[in-house]
Amino acid sequence: MQRRHFVAGLAAAGTLLATPAFADLPSLRFRDMYSRGKDLSEEAIALQGQRIVMTGYMAPPLKPEINFFVLTKTPMATCPFCDDATDWPNDIVLSYFEGDMKFTRFSNLIRVEGTFDTGIETDGPTGFVSKVRLLDTRYTIL
């Protein structure tokens, strides 16, 4: 084996190892989440309980000690806070994480992996009402 082929093979292997593990998961785009108004699409309903990937932006956290962030379709300098499910925007997803997570700048495009969950729920400590969520979330900056 020639040295340059060996080095090229090492570089290719490193690229494969650096590829996120969630590359093979189903993805859901914000525009495909709802069919009409505030009704979830068939695609979104079919993904209930599955690990999925979404791409968007992390809105600034409500408080530094919370265990979730809001994934948004477009960058937002302030966090959208909803106190009623009827006000739930169709371009945000509440994203819960376990343990500590480093928040990123609101203008960084991120790819998020989590278990897709639907239904109206209220976060006890904050009172934040959500219609869709990602559970056990992790992200990478794109």
PLM regions and their residue ranges:
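N-terminal export signals
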Residues: 5-23
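OB-fold and OB-like single-stranded nucleic-acid-recognition modules
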Residues: 22-142
